[in-house]
Amino acid sequence: MARSIKKGPFIDAHLLKKVDAARASNDKRPIKTWSRRSTVLPDFVGLTIAVHNGRQHIPVYVSENMVGHKLGEFALTRTFKGHAASKKAKR
């Protein structure tokens, strides 16, 4: 179920504060955040946000196509190494 339009998009206050400061100072360094649940706003376009994936911060360059999605969608938390090969297929 999607979030109500009446409520508006969710964004952590501390992340919004960091984004506003980066916009004001025209700073190009990545903004570190642990807030995977925050929605990407149009103000974020052109910035690099380092999103935590549980182990490290993954730099995500925000483009216009990402607006409306959550930051966590762009920093994967699981690494798929592939299924184990069957012994029958090896012969």
From Swiss-Prot:
Name of a matching Pfam family: Ribosomal_S19
Keywords: Ribonucleoprotein, Ribosomal protein, RNA-binding, rRNA-binding
Family affiliation: Belongs to the universal ribosomal protein uS19 family.
InterPro entries assigned to the protein according to its UniProt record, in alphabetical order: Ribosomal_uS19 (IPR002222), Ribosomal_uS19_bac-type (IPR005732), Ribosomal_uS19_CS (IPR020934), Ribosomal_uS19_SF (IPR023575)
Chain's role: Protein S19 forms a complex with S13 that binds strongly to the 16S ribosomal RNA.
PROSITE patterns given in the database record: RIBOSOMAL_S19 (PS00323)
Taxonomic lineage of the native organism: Bacteria, Pseudomonadati, Pseudomonadota, Betaproteobacteria, Rhodocyclales
NCBIfam families the record matches: rpsS_bact
GO cellular component, one term: small ribosomal subunit
GO biological process: ribosomal small subunit assembly; translation
Protein name per its UniProtKB record: Small ribosomal subunit protein uS19
GO molecular function, one term: rRNA binding
Organism: Azoarcus sp. (strain BH72)
Cited HAMAP family: Ribosomal_uS19 (MF_00531)
